[in-house]
């Protein structure tokens, strides 16, 4: 197959995969636009459109979480595995929420501290309950929930 034909086929496939782009105008106060441009550069976006798309997607993900849709998230825990029963309580809690947990990863940071990453999927309320339950375990030093989308509701 010639390279020109290969490039045409690739371009056709990519054009079918991408949504139709629509241009629209946005009116902003100059100081707000200046701050947005600083943010856009700081986050290394190639242009304002990419930055704006990400802001819209972040809002759509938040709406998914508020509406009770099926969502995904990662829960990151830091704990001292030498603390009495903390590892057992973390594992017990994971078993209690086994329907929501996709996978876990356990990393030894140093002699005392462990990093546990829990990937979860389910109704937003259930994933939030799992994060709260893990966060509340005595001996967990830090816990965060990173909320995301299954991708079905956002383009």
Positions of predicted regions on the chain:
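Short amphipathic alpha-helix segments
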Residues: 80-101
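Short, charge-rich, low-complexity interaction segments located
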Residues: 52, 61-68
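Short amphipathic alpha-helical segments
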Residues: 26-28, 36, 46-57
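Short Lys/Arg-rich basic patches
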Residues: 4-27
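Short glycine-/aliphatic-rich beta-strand segments at the starts of folded cytosolic domains
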Residues: 69-81, 115-116
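Conserved short beta-strand edge segments in small beta-sheet-based binding/regulatory domains
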Residues: 99-107, 132, 136-151
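Helix N-cap motif at beta-to-alpha junctions
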Residues: 82-83, 120-127
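Short amphipathic alpha-helices in soluble, non-transmembrane regions
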Residues: 89-93, 129-136
């Amino acid at each position: 197959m010639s390279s020109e034909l290969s490039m045409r086929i690739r371009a056709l496939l990519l054009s079918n995969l991408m949504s139709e782009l629509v241009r629209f105008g946005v009116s902003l106060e100059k100081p707000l636009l200046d701050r947005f441009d600083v943010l856009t550069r700081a986050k290394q976006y190639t242009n304002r459109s990419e930055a704006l798309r990400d802001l819209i997607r972040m809002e759509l993900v938040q709406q998914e979480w508020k509406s009770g849709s099926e969502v995904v998230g990662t829960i990151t825990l830091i704990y001292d595995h030498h603390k009495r029963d903390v590892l057992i309580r973390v594992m017990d809690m994971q078993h209690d929420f086994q329907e929501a947990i996709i996978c876990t990863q356990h990393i030894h940071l140093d002699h005392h501290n462990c990093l546990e990453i829990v990937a979860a999927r389910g109704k937003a309320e259930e994933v939030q309950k799992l994060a709260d339950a893990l966060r509340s375990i005595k001996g967990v030093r830090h816990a965060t929930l990173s909320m995301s989308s299954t991708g079905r509701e956002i383009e």
